[in-house]
Amino acid sequence: MVNASKVSKKRKAVTRDVEEEAGVFSGDELNAENLDGALSDNANELSSDEDDSEVELVDEFSDEDDEDEEELDSDEIPSDGEEPKKKSASTAVDGPQADDESSSEDEQPNFRIEKDANGEDRYIYDEINPDDNSDYSDVDENANTIGNIPLKFYDEYPHIGYDINGKKIMRPAKGEALDALLDSIEIPKGWTGLTDPSTGKPLELSQDELELLRKVQMNEIPEEGYDPYEPLMEWFSNKQEIMPLSAAPEPKRRFVPSKHEAKRVMKIVKAIKEGRILPYKPPTEEDEDKDVINYDLWADEAERPDHPMHVPAPKLPPPGYEESYHPPPEYLPDKKERKAWEETDPEDREQEFLPNDFGSLRKVPGYENFVKEKFERCLDLYLAPRVRRSKLNIDPESLLPKLPSPEELKPFPTTCATVFRGHKGRVRTVSVDPSGVWLATGGDDGTLRVWELLTGRQLWTVKLSDEDAVNVVRWRPGKDAVVLAAGVGDDIFLAVPPIVDPELEKASLELIDAGWGYAASRPPPTAAEENKKNTPPQWIRPSAALADSGVCAVIPLRYVVKTLSWHRRGDYFVTVCPGSSTPASVAISIHTLSKHLTQFPFRKRIKGGGPPQTAHFHPSKPILFVANQRTIRAYDLSRQLLVKIVQPGARWISSFDIHPTSSTAAGGDNIIVGSYDRRLLWHDLELSQRPYKTLRYHRKAIRSVKFHPGGRYPLFADASDDGSLQIFHGSVTGDMLSNASIVPLKVLKGHKITGELGVLDVDWHPREAWCVSAGADGTCRLWM
């Protein structure tokens, strides 16, 4: 009886099924923790009148019983006579509830007795079938019961692990080729095509897992009922609170220094003073053992000098475009070239490979001739003879042409002799008359002024406009008459300044008045012709005030005139209106002084290079040079043909000038071009359409360039926005084997930069090596 009671305390078999309240558990599953939790949860439901079974349940689990339970393991075998005792004990625990149920199946034990390897009894318990009130869940047949063990450990065995009873879990059968084909045709529900690494079986997903994957794939929220756009509750900003969130007073530790920290700091300070705490030093290597002697085999090794006859190997040439893995299309051979290369003998081929396009570097295969090329390279290095070639030590200065000294090229202007002041605002244009006595200027104040060149005294002035500036002023060439042409706004004014002797003044007025009779003989234009934009304008007489001042005729062009240039005979002059809104048919106009006639030679815009900028007549041929923004075109007026196109290569041409001795015995056609991109270009038209020389000496745009007229002095000058003028010596010869000689002579500085503008125009004295400049600072200067 004693043994049986002891066994009943250790292991109890459930003798009935608990339907509603699981108050009794088997001895293997019930422990102190389960008991405390069960009693605490059902404390309110228990009545004060507890039955005997509950008292017996508490008595069975005493301290002594716990000690005995620790001594007996689930795999230990009880002695004979314990089983009846255990059955009676379990019956006593059930109490009167067991008497109410008469089912014989409930009285069966939940274990069976088998013999182990030693011939002793072993208890094998049945699998627990939990109900709704149990902590256990249903056993999943597909669950991994072998633990967290990689299946690769069992690759050499027919099983994949062991279950809780120590039996082998055999490897699941794999589908053959026919099963795989059927699965691919009829995909089973939950099929993924993957294998579960924990069980070795096909991985199947539940409907919830599939729905979760679908939501993740569709970028939806996986969690049900989650609202990512809930209204923001600004707890601390939406309502103004009067009382503070915490009215606790500030602790003293926040504003009183800590005494504890002060003590620790003083200890550290004292240790530093006593030398017990030293500053940090980087760790050094441990001192080597002096007894160990290390020998350096290469201590006395000296570099071996090269052999006296040593010649370094020549370097391989760098690879070209044809050796690239992605060469340009023009390097790729076509079918005809590839066939010809393949049919050619390998020794006669120009190159040992054909270029190929692989698209990317990772697609480039191995080079089949790599070993062969390296072998031939080695053969060349030790079989081919080498020769030393001495390098030519050439002084770079010796390659430059020897230019004459500027002292040998005098005279040329070097100093400022006279300053002309009187204009309000910028002085845009300047011109010296053919006699070299008077100087005409025009500026932003709309006045045209004539000065005495040597003294700087103003002789004559006229107000041509209150709003527009005088953009260009030019004297008529020739000494038989004195006529001054000025472009102001969209009008051209022809004036005879009353500064000459009466006979010359009378001849000048008669020259202009002769055209009025010729103009009167022409039929007047109709109303339809007047409405056309390309209708030539009619010359008109000036107002009485302007006529009294010396203005004789006005030409209304309807567009702003920027440049004006006379023909060498003095009967024609050409004007250019470079505005972007100016029609192409009226941008360039040629005027005849003796007939008071204006003509538009171009009906269409010049192709390429933008709108026209300036134009000049050839000094000895019936050729008109017209420059737009990028090119200069030469037109033969007699044959009405395009003769030549000059390409300076500049971005925006500002001005150009023709050499006065062009097409004579002294030389061919030569022109100089100034551009807004700070370049001065010399063109020899018989040599090339491209520039012969390009000079870049200015820091800002070049506004004007000019040759010395007459060809007496081989000089030319340019004016720039950097406030300086540069004088050059440019000589041309009749020898076709020699080129023009260009020598920089002098940089003239005197104008002030105003509004990012410097020197706007420059002109030469007809007989002397003097030049006159007009600046944005409102002054003109004579340089001698």
UniProtKB/Swiss-Prot annotation:
Annotated compartments: Nucleus, Nucleolus; Nucleus, Nucleoplasm
WD repeat residue intervals: 422-461, 465-505, 607-645, 648-693, 697-738, 754-784
Summary of the function given for this chain in its UniProt record: Component of the NOP7 complex, which is required for maturation of the 25S and 5.8S ribosomal RNAs and formation of the 60S ribosome.
Lineage, opening ranks: Eukaryota, Fungi, Dikarya, Ascomycota, Pezizomycotina
Name recorded for this polypeptide: Ribosome biogenesis protein erb1
GO biological process, one term: maturation of 5.8S rRNA from tricistronic rRNA transcript (SSU-rRNA, 5.8S rRNA, LSU-rRNA)
UniProt organism field: Aspergillus terreus (strain NIH 2624 / FGSC A1156)
Compositional bias ranges of the Pro residues kind: 314-331
Domain of life: Eukaryota
Complexes and interactors: Component of the NOP7 complex, composed of erb1, nop7 and ytm1. The complex is held together by erb1, which interacts with nop7 via its N-terminal domain and with ytm1 via a high-affinity interaction between the seven-bladed beta-propeller domains of the 2 proteins. The NOP7 complex associates with the 66S pre-ribosome.
